[in-house]
Design a protein with these regions (language model features):
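Short Gly/Thr/Asp-enriched flexible loops that form oxyanion-binding sites at enzyme active sites
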Residues: 60-71
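Glycine-rich phosphate/pyrophosphate-binding beta-alpha loops
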Residues: 130, 134, 192-205, 268
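Gly/Ser/Thr-rich active-site loops/lids in small-molecule metabolic enzymes
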Residues: 145-157, 198-227
Length: 290
């Protein structure tokens, strides 16, 4: 196959472009282009390749997915980031060599994307849209000075601890939403419109979220769930898996009329007064080689 490699060398503990290219070519493929940064992402489609390979963390994969949305060219993932939620959701595991070797017998799986429209315009997303704990934790993490060349495990644990610190002082705020025409309102600590089960530092908010079923999983956690969220974070910090235990709603369309600081994947947006956000599922907008 002719491969375009979209690679973020700053992600996690990943290999160099040279090493990745050598591995891909060793398995009989031709690397026809290498794209390095998010600013260059639109160049992904310039080369006439059979496959776009996103090598990096969830941010790198999300950027590639937005460029490929609605296009025929499939994407493969080489998970080299910190959380690797998207690869984990598609059960893409193993060494780089093992993952590349599997492409020869792999299948193209349809993958849903979401589209969020609001004061910022329209934006595709692959992981989630939400507010409360996750958005405030992303904002808090962004305020910290970057530390390079740290082991993935340390980065994950620090991110979980940051979520715990944010939760300790977080107040539930009013949200007003409509899920497939059904009105829902309340004061929530966390709201998440999920395309995949995992979010942030491998937090499994809804194990049944499926990026191939044409629906979102929607989680709304209020003050009654504070202790459950805290336990979930404690177990993640200890690298143990335990479910959040909060009801997951199903919806194809979500309208938010009142809310809090909002995140779309890993981008955070302030909530303007009287703003409305519309979130739609776009089934099979992407194809992933697994």
């Amino acid at each position: 196959m002719r491969v375009t490699l979209y690679h973020n060398e700053d992600a996690g503990e990943g290999a160099s472009v040279h090493d990745l290219t050598a591995t891909i070519e060793r398995h009989g493929h031709t690397v026809v282009a290498v794209v390095g940064t998010s600013d260059d992402a639109t160049r992904i489609l310039e080369a006439e390749s059979d496959l776009v390979v996103a090598s990096g963390g969830d941010g790198t994969v999300s950027t590639a997915a937005r460029v490929l949305a609605g296009k025929a060219t499939p994407m493969a993932i080489l998970p080299n980031g910190t959380a690797n939620n998207l690869a984990r959701s598609m059960n893409i595991t193993g060494t780089t060599d093992e993952i590349v070797a599997a492409w020869a017998t792999g299948t193209r799986r349809p993958f849903d994307l979401g589209r969020a429209s609001g004061p910022w315009g329209e934006r595709w997303f692959i992981e989630s849209v939400g507010g409360g704990l996750i958005a405030h934790s992303i904002r808090a993490f962004e305020s910290q000075p970057p530390e390079l060349d740290r082991p993935r495990r340390e980065e994950l644990i620090d991110a979980v601890r940051m979520h715990s610190e944010v939760l300790s002082s977080l107040r539930a705020v009013p949200w007003t939403m409509t899920l497939d025409g059904v009105s829902v309102s309340g004061e929530f600590l966390l709201v998440a419109v999920l395309n995949i089960p995992f979010i942030g530092p491998n937090l499994e908010l809804c194990p049944h979220a499926d990026p191939t079923d044409g629906e979102f999983a929607v989680v709304m956690a209020d003050e009654r769930h504070r202790d459950a969220i805290a336990r979930h974070l404690q177990h993640r910090a200890a690298e143990r898996d335990i479910g959040l235990g909060v009801t997951c709603w199903r919806a194809r369309s979500v309208e938010i009329e009142q809310g809090d600081l909002l995140h779309i994947d890993d981008m955070v947006f302030d909530w303007p007064s009287e703003a409305r956000v519309s979130i739609q599922i776009e089934p099979a907008s992407l194809h992933v080689l697994v």
